[in-house]
Amino acid sequence: MKDQLLVPLRRRPWTCRKCLQRLQLLPQHQTRRSFETAASPFPRQLDSLPADYSRTKTVDDDTLRRVFDSQQFWREFSQQRSAQPKPTGLVQNQYLTSPDGFRTFANVSLQKCQAIVSKVLAASTLEEYRTMARDLDRLSDLLCRVIDLSDFIRVIHPDPQVQEAATQAYALMFEYMNVLNTTTGLNDQLKKAAANPEVTSQWSDEEKIVAQILIKDFSNSAIHMPPHERQRFVNLSNDISQLGSSFVNGAEPAKSHVSVATNNLRGLDPILVQQIKRWNRTAAVPTTGMIPRLALRSVHDENVRREVYLASRTSSKRQLHRLEELLLKRAELAKLSGYESFAHMTLSDKMAKSPEAVSNFLTALVDSNRKLVREELSQLQAMKGAPLQPWDHAYYVHQRVMQYSQARRSRELSAVPEFFSLGTVMQGLSRLFDRLYGVRLVPQEPAPGETWNPDVRRLDVVDESGRHIAVIYCDLFSRPNKHPNPAHFTLRCSREISTEEVAECASLDQSSHPNDGMATAVDPVTKTLRQLPTIALVCDFSEPGTNGGGRPSLLSEHSVRTLFHEMGHAVHSILGQTRLQSISGTRCATDFAELPSVLMEHFATAPSVLALYARHWRTDEPLSEGMIRSMERDRTAHGSIYGAVENEAQILMALVDQAYHSRPADGGRIDSTALYQQVSQQHSSLPEPADVTPPTSWQGFFGHLYGYGATYYSYIFDRAIANKLWVDVFGAGRQAVDRAAGERYKNEVLRWGGGRSGWECVAGALGSANESNADGRLVEGGDEAMREVGRWGLGRDGVSG
C-alpha cells in the first residue's frame, strides 16, 4: 500500500540480495526499571510500574548478552513480571489483550479518523488551515497505527484467531483509506492551505514537506480527474495488482526438465543423480529449484551445462504474457496520470527524479565495474583454455573457490562462529551505538501478553541521560511456520503528540491513552509528549541450548552482516525522530531507504568493531588478530573470484527494469524478450547467446519487476553511497567507533528521517571540502550527481565463502 494516499511513505521491508542469502545472574525479584517517561500525561492508574535505568551500563551490557545466549537465564529474567495481575496488550497496545481487541482498536481509530476528516472538510479560518498539515499527518498516523501493526501481527502471530482478527482490522482500515482516496474535499482543502502564504509562512519545514507528500499522493490516486477517468484509474490499479500477483507467483520455465544421459552428469552429487534418474539410463534435470543451480556449478560436460542454462532461463509464453500485460497497464496508468512513462511517474519523488538520471548512474556504474569484471573473467577463461560462455561461469567460479579453499583458506575460519554468539553480537551492536551515537540497548522483561511468542526479547533504547527513546522487539529464533527472511518492521512511528490530543483523550475515557498504551516519553527540550518508535526485528537463527550451560546460537559471518543490516534500518527509525510521523525514520525516498542498512554491514567486520564484541562463547577470549586477518583475506579472495560479476548482474537487472518502465505510454506492444536481449548484448560481459531459438527470457523469473518497478536500481545506488561514506566519513573503518564520525553521520543523515532531501544528507555528510562534492554540487542532485555516484563504483563487495 506504499503508494496509497494518507499512508504516504509506508515501507515494506526491503528484501535485498544480502538479506535473502544472511553474564552475571541478576537478583530474581528486582524492581522494574524506570526511565524518564510519561506513560500517561494525565492522572490515571498505570498498568505497570515506571522503570529505572539508573543501574550501571555494565550490568545491562552483561544482561543483554545473556538474554540471547542462555534460555535458562531468559526464562528467569522474562518471568519477573509474571505476577502482574492485569495482562498487557500485544506490544503494550491497551486494546490487544484478546482477538476481539483488534476490532475495538480499529473502530476507535476509525472514529478518530472520521473526526479529523470532518474537521478538515469544514475548515474555513486561517487558524484551521494552519493546522491542516498536522491534522492530515495525524490522520495518516491513525491509519498506520492499525494497518502496520495488524499487517505484522497477522503474519507473525502463531494463533489463527489472532491472525484472523488482525486481518479483519487491517481490511477495515484499508477499505476506509480507499474511501479517503476518493474524498476530493481533502485534496481541495490541502491545496487551498498550501497555496496561501499566510498559512505556509506559519508552517514548519516538516509541515511543508508533509503537505507536498500528501498532495503528490492525492495526485497519484487520480483524485483530480473527472469521474470516468478516476474510475479508469481504479480499474487499471486493480488490474496491475492482480497481474503483478500472478506474475510473482506464476514464474515458470518453458520446459519443466532437460533429458540428459546419466553418464553425462559426472560431477553432480550421485545422490542427486539417483533422485532424477529414469529407467532408460537418462535423467530428467529439473529447470527450477536447487538441482539446476548445482548442475551448472558442478557438471563437467559443457553441453549439459549449456542445455540446463538455456532451459532454466527461458520462461513460458504464459508468464511472458503476464509481464507484458503488466507493463502495458502501467504505461497506460502513467499516461492517464499525465506522465511520459511509468518510470517518470514513479521516480518523480525519488532522489533520481527521472529515468534519464538512473540511466546516467547505471551506465557510469557499468564503466567503473568493467575492469574488475574483465580481471575475474580472464582468470576463469585461463582455467578453461577457451572462450568463456555464460553457462561456464558458475562452474569455473566453483572450481576456483574449491582451489582456494584447499590451498589457502585457513582452518581457523571454521571456528569463527564460536566467537559470534547471538548475545555477543547484540552486545556489540549496543556498544557500537553507544560509541557512535550515545544510545544503547537495554533488555526489558516483557509484561504478560506483551509479546506474540515467549522467545521474543524486548529491548529498550536509552540515551546517555537515561531517557527512553525507542522499543525493539527481537523475534530472532526459528520456529515452525515462521517466515525465514530477515526483516525490520516499524510497528509505530515516532511523532509529537499535541496537547489537544492529550486533552481529547482525557475527556473521552480515563482509561484511554494518547498512544494506545504504547511507549511515550516527554521531550526534555520542548516538554511535549512523544510517541516512541516501536520496531520489530525478525530473523531465523537457531535456538540456543535449553540447559543452563547450553551452546548459544552461533552465527556465521554472513548472518552477522545480515543482523547488522537489519539493525541499520532500526537505528534509522530510532534516531530519525521527527515531529510528524509521515517523514519519521525509514519513511524516506525508496532510493535512500537502504543507505543506513547497507552502511551498517561495513561495521560488522571492521577490526575496531570486532574488538567490541567478538569473543568466544565458552572461554570469553577475543577473536585474535590472526583470525581477523584470515577473515579479511577470505572476503577479499572470494570477492576477487566473483564479486564484480555479481555486481554486473545486479546492474543489468536494474537496466532491464528501466528499459521496461521507461517506454512511452503510446509505444505499443512491448516485446520484453527483445528488450532483455538488447540490454544483455549491450552491457553484459557474458551476454546471452544470440543464436538460440527461442531466445532466453530470464525476465519472466524477475519477480522484483512488480514490487520494485522502475526502482530496482535503489539497492546498488545506496551501496555506492554507503561505500563512499564508509571511506570518507568513517575512514574505511579507521574511525568506525569514533564519536565525531558517528555524530556527523547522525546529524547529517539519520536524524532527518525523510524530512530532508537525500542529496542534502549525502552532501552534508561528505562536506563541501570533499572532491566529489566540491562547492556543494551534490546538494541539488540531478543527472550529473547521479553520474558521479555511478563513478564511485561498488568495489568487489567481497563476502565470506
UniProtKB/Swiss-Prot annotation:
Catalysed reaction, written as an equation: Release of an N-terminal octapeptide as second stage of processing of some proteins imported into the mitochondrion
Keywords on record: Hydrolase, Metal-binding, Metalloprotease, Mitochondrion, Protease, Transit peptide, Zinc
Major subcellular location class: mitochondrion
Cofactor binding description: Binds 1 zinc ion.
Names of required cofactors: Zn(2+)
Superkingdom of the source species: Eukaryota
Positions annotated to bind Zn(2+): H565, H569, H572
Signal peptide: none
A molecular function GO annotation: metal ion binding
Record-level GO BP terms: peptide metabolic process; protein processing involved in protein targeting to mitochondrion
Annotated organelle transit peptide span: 1-42
Protein family per UniProt: Belongs to the peptidase M3 family.
Purpose of the protein: Cleaves proteins, imported into the mitochondrion, to their mature size. While most mitochondrial precursor proteins are processed to the mature form in one step by mitochondrial processing peptidase (MPP), the sequential cleavage by MIP of an octapeptide after initial processing by MPP is a required step for a subgroup of nuclear-encoded precursor proteins destined for the matrix or the inner membrane.
Protein name as catalogued: Mitochondrial intermediate peptidase
Organism: Neosartorya fischeri (strain ATCC 1020 / DSM 3700 / CBS 544.65 / FGSC A1164 / JCM 1740 / NRRL 181 / WB 181)
Gene: oct1
